[in-house]
Amino acid sequence: MRRKLAAGNWKMNGTGAALDALEAIAGAHSAAAVDLLICPPATLLYRAAQVAEGSRVRIGGQDCHAVTAGAHTGDISAMMLADAGASAVILGHSERRADHGETDAQVCDKARAALEAGLIAIICIGETLAQREAGQTLDVVCAQLAGSVPDGIDGTRVVVAYEPVWAIGTGLVPTLEQIAEVHDTLRQQLIGRFGSETAEAIRLLYGGSVKPGNAAEIFAVSNVDGALVGGASLTAADFSPIVSALEQAAG
C-alpha cells in the first residue's frame, strides 16, 4: 500500500521568519497518518531541518545538480542537500524547465544523483495549455515520464508529480476526469516499463492550484497519492486543511 504524501514547495519564498509556519505545520500534525514534506528555499534548508527535527515533517530541496561536486557556481549537489538535512528533492519542475531550459535527460541525470545520495526523487511532469488544447497531453506527459525517470529504480524512492503547467499558480484546475485520465495513464506506463511491483510502489502526486476547497475531491481520484502544493503550503492555515483532507482519503 502506497503511503499518501503531502509535499509543500515554497519556491523562492521565505526568510527566517517563515520557519514559524513550518513549526505550526509540524505542531498541527504531530500524529499525521500521511507523509509530510516541506521544500523551502536552499537558504532555509538547514534551519528548517532543525525546526522539523523530531516531528512528522521531513525537509526537501527544490533542485540539485547531477554531479557530486566541482566548478558549478551557484549549484547544489544532492549530497549537499542530504548533508543539510534533506530527505527528498523536487526535480524537473516546470518553472525549472522554463526558466533554466532543463531537459528530460538532465532531469533524469539529477534524479539518478538524488537516488544515489539517498534522497527521494520527486520528478515533475506536465503539459502546457497549448499542448492540452491541441490534444497532446498524454503524449507529452508520457514522453516526459519516459525521459525523466531513470532505469533500475526502487519504486519507494521515486515520486512522480503531475503538474499541468497551465494550472500552476493560476487558480485553474483540470477536471477530475482529466486528472484521472493522466494519473491512470501514468500508472499503466510505469507498469509497462518497470513491472507491477515497482510501478505500484511509485507515488503519483497531483499539483497545480491545490487548495483547501478542492483538495478532498482531488484526493478521491484514482491513482492520486497526494499533492505537491505551492502557494497553499506557505501557511499552516492553508496547508493543514489539505493535509487533513489527505488523511481522510487515506482512511
Curated annotation (Swiss-Prot):
Subcellular localization: Cytoplasm
Predominant place of localization: cytoplasm
InterPro entries: Aldolase_TIM (IPR013785), TIM_sf (IPR035990), TrioseP_Isoase_bac/euk (IPR022896), Triosephosphate_isomerase (IPR000652), Triosephosphate_isomerase_AS (IPR020861)
UniProt cross-references to PROSITE patterns, sorted A to Z: TIM_1 (PS00171), TIM_2 (PS51440)
One Gene Ontology cellular component annotation held by this UniProt entry: cytosol
Catalytic machinery residues: 93, 163
Pathway per the UniProt entry: Carbohydrate biosynthesis; gluconeogenesis; Carbohydrate degradation; glycolysis; D-glyceraldehyde 3-phosphate from glycerone phosphate: step 1/1
Enzyme class of the recorded protein, top EC level: isomerase
Catalytic activity: D-glyceraldehyde 3-phosphate = dihydroxyacetone phosphate
Gene Ontology molecular functions: triose-phosphate isomerase activity
Its EC number(s): 5.3.1.1
Binding site residues for substrate: 9-11, 169, 209, 230-231
Assembly and interaction partners: Homodimer.
Family indicated by similarity: Belongs to the triosephosphate isomerase family.
Function: Involved in the gluconeogenesis. Catalyzes stereospecifically the conversion of dihydroxyacetone phosphate (DHAP) to D-glyceraldehyde-3-phosphate (G3P).
Protein name: Triosephosphate isomerase
Species, as recorded: Ruegeria pomeroyi (strain ATCC 700808 / DSM 15171 / DSS-3) (Silicibacter pomeroyi)
